[in-house]
């Protein structure tokens, strides 16, 4: 993927996120929060930012224009691009890019970096080996997807892993028998959309050993629960929740979106 003026900062070790605001300011997160970054050749103006955003999305097969002013796109490797153009922003475009780890995360490296106590290692490994259903929760930027991917790396090589995502963030796993499914938006006529719920249902006919949903944010939680309760063990997903105590209410809220009785969750 060609990142143009952002190529240098994107290639720096430790950079996880890059953002471009509509005034042309570039921000980068090197693990300590967003900090401004000076480009060697800055954007010349709002139109240059917009043109750059359109080119980024076009590379990844997504439209970004007056008819479709918001775009989400990703590469097979897990680089994620989100862009919004004027008039939804004051001028130009607002661009957000999330970069995957250059080296696939491992549970050992995450423990060494302080994501969780080293004493949790046997517990997490046991979840994978016993094919337990796993729900990874946390706030924005907490590393939910990173931990999920590290756990998937512990799956037996022969397992058939089906991943379902709105935007491909997990990237390609080290499994020969891995299928990565992503949703599709509607076309100009408002037809052809394929959502998470449809994809989860499709996985049931794909002989999965594990069904993995990148993140549950809506009624698709019901389809995943049905899959896990129908004999498909070892499923995994993530859920946004700032505190563990908020998880039950979040699950109930998502279930209500699919008209599920609160007692069922």
What is each stretch, according to the model?
Residues 2-8, 56-73, 159, 258-264:
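Active-site phosphate-binding and catalytic loops of NTP-dependent enzymes
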Residues 21, 29, 98, 137-139, ...:
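Generic beta-strand/beta-sheet core signal
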Residues 25-130:
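P-loop NTP-binding catalytic core
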Residues 127, 139-140:
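P-loop (Walker A) phosphate-binding loop of NTP-binding proteins
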Residues 131-134, 150-265:
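Switch/coupling sub-region of P-loop NTPases
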Residues 147:
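Hydrophobic positions on the alpha1 helix immediately C-terminal to the Walker A/P-loop
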């Amino acid at each position: 993927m060609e990142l143009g003026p952002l190529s240098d900062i994107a290639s720096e070790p430790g950079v996880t996120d890059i953002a471009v605001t509509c005034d042309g300011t570039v921000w980068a997160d090197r693990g300590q929060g967003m900090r401004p970054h000076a480009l060697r050749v800055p954007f010349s103006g709002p139109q240059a930012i917009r043109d750059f955003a359109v080119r980024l999305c076009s590379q990844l097969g997504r439209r970004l224009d007056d008819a479709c002013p918001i775009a989400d796109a990703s590469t097979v490797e897990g680089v994620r691009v989100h862009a919004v153009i004027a008039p939804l922003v004051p001028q130009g475009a607002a661009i957000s890019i999330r970069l995957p780890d250059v080296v696939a995360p491992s549970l050992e490296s995450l423990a060494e970096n302080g994501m969780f106590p080293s004493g949790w290692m046997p517990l997490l490994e046991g979840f994978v080996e016993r094919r337990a259903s796993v729900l990874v929760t946390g706030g924005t930027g907490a590393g939910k997807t990173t931990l999920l991917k590290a756990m998937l790396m512990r799956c037996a090589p022969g397992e058939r892993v089906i991943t379902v995502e709105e935007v491909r963030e997990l990237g390609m796993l080290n499994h020969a028998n891995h299928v990565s499914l992503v949703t599709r938006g509607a076309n100009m006529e408002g037809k052809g959309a394929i959502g998470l719920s449809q994809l989860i249902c499709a996985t049931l006919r794909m002989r999965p050993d594990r069904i993995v949903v990148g993140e549950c944010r809506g009624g698709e939680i019901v389809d995943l629960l049905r899959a896990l309760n129908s004999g498909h063990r070892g499923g995994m997903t993530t859920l946004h929740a700032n505190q563990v105590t908020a998880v039950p209410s979040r699950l109930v809220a998502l279930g209500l979106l699919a008209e599920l009785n609160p007692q069922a969750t």
